[in-house]
């Protein structure tokens, strides 16, 4: 859990007392440098089109993102499937704004260290080969790095107690999972498919000792969630305008393409809370939602 003093230090900047600043947040699922570049660029575009001040506020972990949204210290947050469900359940009248084109059919990957000489598997039953290995997830509250991988492992009859030491690691982010398995600190891990593919393409040294073991079936994942009372601060029609700006980011425009590329997307599309019902059900089953 995040301590009250830590949250106070994160959300005590003067920007939080200014009702005319739209505060953007995001789960810290990757290296902070990547996140800073992506969300500062996104915030700048929002500010330009909405004609309001927009500020990106980094948070230290997934719990802080959910808590910051619940306490209304964050107005618009880029959540994963699970963290978004958690945030919306804790924040009455919150609104699902949009998702990327890739989020309605998202996937995770399981990776292994090449020294294991494990061949890729073709179906879920092969996950049993991961028993008795040192295995790491990403963040404890990650959809693609923990919730869905654990769900698929369970479907194959593999529980956390079956890993070496009767426990699993939690790296904290997808990038960290790659680094830990590549170094041999862990034998295997699970992460976001897009982050895996980006590292294969752009950071070959970081993946030089890794083998793709399995790609999961599709599920719904990331989405933008906004507070339900933004119009009280920014005026009538603001939420509709905010949604329109995000949905109309156009890959044919240079500045928009730069943003969309950083989100690994061609466009943002409409999304509804009911799409995440299955994520909520799995979250409850795995005790990530109570």
What is each PLM-predicted segment?
Residues 18-83:
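Extracytoplasmic small-molecule ligand-binding "clamshell" domains
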Residues 78-91, 154-155, 180-183, 187-208:
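A ligand-binding cleft/hinge motif common to bilobed small-molecule-binding domains
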Residues 100-156:
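A conserved helix-loop-strand patch within extracytoplasmic ligand-binding domains
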Residues 108-119, 220-234:
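A bilobed periplasmic-binding-protein/Venus flytrap-type ligand-binding module shared by bacterial periplasmic
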């Amino acid at each position: 859990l995040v301590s009250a003093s830590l949250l106070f230090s994160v959300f005590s900047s003067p920007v939080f007392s200014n009702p005319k600043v739209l505060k953007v947040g995001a789960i810290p699922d990757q290296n902070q440098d990547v996140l800073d570049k992506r969300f500062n660029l996104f915030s700048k575009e929002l500010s330009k089109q909405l004609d309001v001040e927009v500020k990106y506020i980094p948070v230290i972990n997934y719990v802080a993102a959910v808590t910051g949204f619940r306490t209304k210290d964050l107005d618009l947050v880029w959540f994963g499937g699970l963290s978004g469900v958690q945030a919306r359940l804790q924040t009455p009248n919150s609104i699902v704004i949009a998702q990327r084109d890739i989020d309605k059919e998202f996937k995770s990957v399981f990776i292994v260290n090449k020294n294991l000489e494990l061949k890729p598997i073709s179906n879920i039953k092969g996950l049993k080969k991961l028993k008795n290995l040192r295995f790491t997830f990403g963040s404890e509250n990650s959809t693609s790095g923990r919730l869905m991988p654990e769900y698929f492992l369970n479907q194959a009859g593999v529980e956390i107690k079956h890993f070496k030491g009767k426990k699993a690691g939690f790296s904290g982010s997808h990038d960290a999972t790659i680094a830990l398995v590549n170094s041999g600190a862990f034998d295997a891990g699970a992460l976001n498919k897009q982050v895996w593919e980006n590292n294969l393409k752009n950071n070959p040294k970081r993946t030089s000792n890794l083998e793709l073991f399995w790609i999961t079936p599709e599920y719904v994942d990331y989405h933008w969630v906004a507070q339900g009372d933004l119009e009280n601060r920014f005026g009538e029609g603001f939420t509709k305008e905010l949604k329109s700006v995000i949905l109309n980011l156009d890959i044919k425009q240079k500045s928009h393409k730069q943003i969309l590329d950083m989100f690994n997307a061609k466009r943002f599309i409409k999304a509804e809370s009911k799409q995440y019902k299955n994520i909520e059900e799995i979250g409850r089953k795995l005790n990530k939602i109570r």
